[in-house]
Amino acid sequence: MSVRLAVPDWSLLVPPLIIVGTIVLLLIVDAVLRRPPARLLLTLAFAGQVLALASLWTIDWAQGATTFGQSYRADWFALAVALVALIAGALSVLVSAGYTESGLDPEGIGQAEYLSLLLFSVLGTMLVGAAGDFIVLLLGLEMSAVAVYALTAFARRRVTSVEGALKYFLLGAFASAILIYGMAWVYGSTGSIVLRDIAETLRTVVMPGQPLDPALLLALLLLAVGLGFKIAAVPFHMWTPDAYQGAPTPVSAYMSVVPKVAGFAAVARVLVQGLQPLSEQWTGLLGMLAAITMIYGNVVAIAQRDLKRMLGYSAIGHTGYMLAGLAAFTTGQAGDRSVGSVLFYLFAYTFMNIGAFGVIAWLQERGLGTTLDDIAGLAGRAPLAALTMAIFMLSLMGMPPLLGFYAKYYVILALIEAGQLWLAVAIVVMSAVSAFFYLRVVTRMYFEEPAGALQPARTPVLGLGLALTTLATLVLGLVSSPILDLVQRWSAALA
């Protein structure tokens, strides 16, 4: 009897394969040229991601085709995640320009390794977005996370960098084990690891209004713990402030966005697609996590004096806002609005947060530290840098007509339509609380005397990254409605 093996459709994998090729090319160039120019490596890394972005439009995402069985899904949701991940990765390469051009490490850990790890994490995030089963989803999450563990410790001579990386790694390992345990319980209850098959099985066994089977309840709680760590939701956030503060600033910029994209993509795939019949249970759980997370993140950020640590707690608060968007999920078109609002938030957050960390990196290149005292009177020393930082702070706060305002507005709108008024009010109140620490940055820059002159430095590539993020923050809010309509249609792929 002859056996015919299924042939994978490699055309669906062109974007991630381009990233793989770019990683290999970076390492080959580094090995052949010994010490290649930093600009060459930056150009290769940036061009590879731009090429991968362009290749996204060669795939017919509307078909929702699968390959490798049902493990890899090329649907609209996968496109949305890949788009955000590649944009964030490309911007992070630009923001890293000053850091890589300095040589990173005189003992040999340098540019090629740094950029390869960054691209490896982008690749993992793309796999999470396209995951059709638990195996690919877990593989993508770990690819993304392990690379960031290493990047966090790149400033290995600084104790805070190694400490932050070690804490991130250890807690991440525990969280991954818990996540796998939760997946095992789902498999034991449904007999499948394929997300769509899990949903179909649950629709036949879960009755509305009936108590949930203890095995499924345990699985849901374990998955919530594991995924909660990936997105830095309270109380699974302990690694975040130390990792953000200790990591090199370009890594902090990247870490604040791409792992969060991977985490929320995993939450959407697992809960919205795989466990959709349990939405009555998990929307309530996400609502409570969202409220606790946004309150804790914004309140604790007020006490921070270090800008990177403040942005770490700010990131926790923004995780709460995005969780609130998922808590608004209901079946049908309203569910598309819920997931669409979160995708739009991630898109907006990419520009705002990478831009804010980019300004800090720009200041460090000129001899300043990362505390509030270091930026005192910045408007008198570097007026353009102060203006750029002020734009990002106001956008993160949610000031209209900047991009961050529309991100919060669409989440609040989804909550109101879902009848979750208390969470909508919580977002408004916490946004007002966040004004305290965001505006404090602005007032320190504009209403205090300069402490001294900046050291001269040439960082044109970093400047380009800041220009792009600033332009996006200012302009994309004005065309936010069609972007939201688009991502809402893409979110329907999870149904």
UniProtKB/Swiss-Prot annotation:
Record's bilayer topology term? Multi-pass membrane protein
Where does this polypeptide localize?
Cell membrane
Write down the top EC class of this protein. translocase
| Pfam families xrefs | Proton_antipo_M (PF00361)
Query: Its principal location?
Result: membrane
InterPro entries (alphabetical): NADH-Q_OxRdtase_suN/2 (IPR010096), ND/Mrp_TM (IPR001750)
* Single GO biological process annotation from the record: ATP synthesis coupled electron transport
Please verify whether the record's keywords include Membrane: yes
List where the protein spans the membrane.
Answer: 12-32, 40-60, 76-96, 117-137, 168-188, 216-236, 247-267, 282-302, 310-330, 342-362, 385-405, 419-441, 459-479
Q: Which GO terms describe its cellular component?
A: plasma membrane
User: Which superkingdom, per the lineage?
Assistant: Bacteria
Catalytic reactions on record: a quinone + NADH + 5 H(+)(in) = a quinol + NAD(+) + 4 H(+)(out)
**What HAMAP family is this protein classified in?**
NDH1_NuoN_1 (MF_00445)
Q: Which family does it belong to?
A: Belongs to the complex I subunit 2 family.
How is this protein organized at the quaternary level?
NDH-1 is composed of 14 different subunits. Subunits NuoA, H, J, K, L, M, N constitute the membrane sector of the complex.
Protein's UniProt name: NADH-quinone oxidoreductase subunit N
Organism of origin: Thermomicrobium roseum (strain ATCC 27502 / DSM 5159 / P-2)
Organism ancestry: Bacteria, Pseudomonadati, Thermomicrobiota, Thermomicrobia, Thermomicrobiales
> Which gene name does the record give?
nuoN
